[in-house]
Regions:
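Terminal helix/beta-alpha structural elements that buttress the NAD(P)+-binding lobe
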Residues: 2-28, 35-76, 81-347
Length: 347
C-alpha cells in the first residue's frame, strides 16, 4: 500500500496555504521519492503565492510550491543508480513547474536524480534545506554556457587567474556562489553589509565591499584594476528601486574591467540598463537539470564537497515552523527579512 501523502496547497493567488491530502506518486525511471524532513522557504514562493499566474503563466491551481528539500529516500526509479531507500539526501524540488508531484511543500516529493546529492550524517536536515535552490541558481549563473560559462568546481580547485564579482555575498544564493566560484578556481570580489564582511570573507571572497556605500561601484572597479574579469553575478531582492542600483553597479564594473562583459542576473532587470557589448540574462535556477551543469554540481562536486567540508551550509537555518501547517507562518517570518540566514520548516 502506498504511503499517505499530505501537502500545503496554494488554491488561489493571494490565499493562505491549505493543508490537505495529496496523491503519492511513484517515481519515473530517473526519479526518487523523498520523505521530506526539512523544507527551505524562498522569496519566490511568497511572490508566487501573491501573484500566481500573473508571475508565471503556467502556474495552475491548486498548486504545491517549494524548491528546497532534505530528507530520506523511500523509493527509486528503475534507472537510478546513485541512491537507494534509506539514503539521506538533499535535493532541488520543482515547485515552479506544472507538476505538483515535484513541489517541496508536501510529505513525499518526487525529485530528479540529477538534482539530488547524498547528505553526510554530520549535516542536519535543517542545515541542508538552505542549499538546493541557492546552489542551483548560483550554478546556473556561473557555469551554464549561455551565462558566465566558468569552468566547473573541482577538489582541489584549479586556479584560473580570473576574478568574478558576486553582488550580494551574504544571501543564500551569494553564499553558494562564492563557494562554487572559489572551488572552480576563481578569485571572488563581493558585497554585503559591513556586519557580514567576516562571514563573506569566510566563504572565500578576497575582498568585500559595503553595497550601501556611495562609492561602492568605484571601489570595486578599482579592485578589478590589473585583474582579468570573468564577469558578474548580480543578486537582488524584491525592492525594484534597489535592484536597479544592483544591476547598474554590476554593469558598470564589467564595462570598465578587462575581460568578460556579462552579468548573470539573479534579479529582475530592465534590458535598457544593459549597454551594447554587454551580455545579460535572467537566471532560472532549475535549468541545470536539463544540461551538463546538473550532474557536474549535484553528482560530481557537492556530495564529496559536503563530506569533506569544502562546501558548507553557510547560510544558517532559521527554523520558523514545524509541520506543513507551519509553512504559512514561516512565509510571514521570511517577509520581514533575514540576514545570512534562511527560513526553514521541519517536518
Amino acid at each position: 500500500m502506498a504511503p499517505t501523502n499530505t501537502a500545503a496547497w496554494l488554491t488561489a493567488a493571494n490565499s493562505p496555504l491549505a493543508v490537505g491530502p495529496a496523491p503519492y506518486t511513484t517515481p519515473s525511471p530517473t526519479q526518487l521519492v523523498i520523505r521530506n524532513h526539512a523544507l527551505g522557504i524562498n522569496m519566490v514562493d511568497i511572490v508566487v503565492q501573491q501573484l500566481g499566474p500573473a508571475l508565471f503563466s503556467w502556474i495552475k491551481f491548486p498548486h504545491i510550491l517549494g524548491s528546497d528539500i532534505a530528507g530520506e529516500v523511500v523509493e527509486v526509479g528503475s534507472s537510478v543508480t546513485r541512491f537507494k531507500p534509506g539514503d539521506r539526501v538533499v535535493a532541488m524540488a520543482a515547485g515552479l513547474t506544472e507538476d505538483n508531484t515535484q513541489g517541496a511543500f508536501q510529505t513525499y516529493s518526487v525529485a530528479g536524480e540529477v538534482v539530488a546529492s547524498h547528505l553526510p550524517a554530520s549535516i542536519s536536515y535543517a542545515q541542508a534545506a538552505v542549499l538546493p535552490l541557492a546552489v542551483g541558481t548560483a550554478a546556473c549563473g556561473l557555469f551554464q554556457k549561455n551565462y558566465l560559462a566558468l569552468q566547473h568546481p573541482t577538489i582541489p580547485p584549479k586556479p584560473t587567474g580570473e576574478t568574478v564579482l558576486i553582488w550580494g555575498g551574504a544571501t543564500s544564493v551569494g553564499s553558494a556562489a562564492i563557494q562554487l566560484a572559489v572551488a572552480a578556481g576563481y578569485e571572488v570580489i563581493s558585497t554585503s553589509s559591513p556586519k557580514n564582511f567576516d562571514y563573506v570573507r569566510g566563504l572565500g571572497a578576497s575582498a568585500v565591499f559595503d553595497y550601501a556605500s556611495p562609492t561602492v561601484t568605484a571601489d570595486i572597479i578599482a579592485a578589478f584594476a590589473g585583474k582579468k574579469s570573468a564577469g558578474a553575478l548580480a543578486i537582488g531582492g524584491f525592492d525594484p528601486a534597489v535592484n536597479v542600483g544592483v544591476v547598474q553597479a554590476c554593469v558598470d564594473v564589467v564595462v570598465k574591467s578587462e575581460g568578460r562583459k556579462f552579468v548573470a542576473m539573479a534579479v529582475q532587470f530592465d534590458p535598457a540598463q544593459v549597454p551594447e557589448g554587454v551580455g545579460a540574462k535572467f537566471i532560472f535556477g532549475s535549468d541545470l537539470k536539463d544540461n551538463e551543469v546538473g550532474p557536474a554540481i549535484f553528482e560530481h562536486f557537492l556530495p564529496k564537497a559536503l563530506e569533506e567540508g569544502v562546501f558548507k551550509c553557510a547560510t544558517m537555518p532559521l527554523v520558523a515552523g514545524e509541520g506543513l501547517e507551519g509553512i504559512q507562518g514561516a512565509f510571514e517570518v521570511s517577509k520581514k527579512g533575514v540576514s545570512a540566514q534562511k527560513v526553514v520548516v521541519t517536518l
